[in-house]
Amino acid sequence: EDLTGRKLVSTKGTTPLKAVEQANRERLMGLTIVEAPDHARALEMVEKGEADAFLMDDVLLFGLAANRPDPKALKVVGRFLTTEPLAIMLPKNDVAFKKVVDEEMRRLITSRDIYDIYDKWFLRPIPPKGTALNMPVSYLLRDSWKYPTDHVPF
C-alpha cells in the first residue's frame, strides 16, 4: 500500500515479480513494474534512482545490501508479499538418513542451538569478506521453530 504509484523493479522470472504484478492488478495500486535481467541490475536501478524499490526475497536483499560499498544506504522494509517454504531434499527411500536429519533438526530447535547457528550466519560477519547480513529472524521462521515438523504448512 505504501508503494502506490511508485516504480518497482524485480528480477525477471521470479516469484516476487509475479506476486507484485498480481497484487498490482487486484488492488489497483498503479505501480509501474520493471523487469531487470538479474539482481545486480535491479539493485543498480534503485541506487541510480531509476526505480523506487527492488522487490525480492528478503534473504537475497539482505545479502545484496550487505555487499554494497555503503550497506547503510539501503534498507530492507515491509511485510512479506509471498511466503515460500524451503526444504531439505533427501533420497526418497533412505529412511535411516531421514531419521538422522529429522532428529538433528529437532535437537537443534529444542536445544535452541538453532539460534546460535542462525546468528552465526545471518547476524555476524561471515566469510569470505567478513560481511554481516544483519538479517533478524523473521516471525515466520521463529514460529516454525516452536513446533518442529517435516510437513510443509502450505
Regions found by a protein language model. Name each.
Residues 1-154:
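Proline/Glycine/Serine-rich low-complexity intrinsically disordered segments
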